[in-house]
Every structure is written in structure tokens, then in C-alpha cells.
Amino acid sequence: MHFIEYNRQAAVDYALKWAHSRNPNYYDFDGAGGDCTNFASQCVYAGCKVMNYEKDIGWYYNSVNDRAAAWSGVEYLRKFLLNNNSVGPFASSVSLSHLQLGDLIQLNNGFEYYHTLVVTGFSSGTPLVCAHTDDSYMRSLDTYYYNFASALHIIGAGNY
């Protein structure tokens, strides 16, 4: 196993390019619970270029019917990134003030995590994000309504 550095600029460039449109290589989950985590996974993939194909616990996308739950599910992505010690990206939970470009923010309503955002900039220290479902381009985190936000710092990825 070797470490792959996360290409933050590639993740940000992807997010900025596709924030208000859909990459035809991926299914649009807007009509099936939301596309935010699918979009965030695409951005992370752009930054690491490696998937984890373990059937029940991995992070991958081949098609709408052949994908890991972690690719498009908010809580599943969170669990995968924070617990992965194998192939694919991995993350640590940090404070919002320690976020970097290409990192993720997940919003919680007090009961569950329900939305995933990609950090694409900062304004006076406040994260600016891109997201799908409620499509957003360089939107300030301050404009969202949530009980609390969890910051996921993408450390890198593992690969064979």
C-alpha cells in the first residue's frame, strides 16, 4: 500500500466546473434523495483518482446500479472517509477553521447528517462551497441553515 497525495486543486476545479450542471458520466440523484454526496464523491475522486471496490464497505461508482453506498449516501461517505485504512481516500474530522480547499463539510440538523458540501474557497475565513441538490457555486457556509457542521479534511488516499 502506498500513499497518494490529494490533489486539492483538481477537486476544486472539478467542483467549479460541474456545480451548476451534471457530468453525463454519473447518474443524477436529484430525483432519488439528492445529488450532493454523489457530486462530492466525484470531486474527491478528481483529487485522488482511486476507488475502493470492496463490495459492502468500499467507495466506488461504475453505474447507478453498481456503486457503493458511500458514493452517494451522506452518512455512508462520512463513515467511509473517517474509517478507511485501505484503498481510496481517507479523512480526519477537524474544526471548520482547519479546512482546506477540496475538503468536505457535512451539515447536521440535530438528528442526522443530510447535506455534503465541497470547499472551493474562503472569504474572510468563512468557507465558500459548491454543492448539488440545491446547486451552489462559491456559496458562503454562513448562508446555510443547520444545527452543526462537520468538517472532513481529506488527508490523501491509499493505493496498491
Question: Which residue stretches match the model-derived regions?
Answer:
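Glycine-rich, aromatic-bearing surface loops/beta-hairpins
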Residues: 119-120, 124-160
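General "foldedness" signal
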Residues: 25, 29, 54, 91, ...
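Residue-level signal for the start and early helices of compact helical domains
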Residues: 20, 68, 90, 143-145
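N-terminal capping segments
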Residues: 1-72
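...with weaker cross-activation on analogous glycine-rich loops/strands in unrelated enzymes
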Residues: 61-132
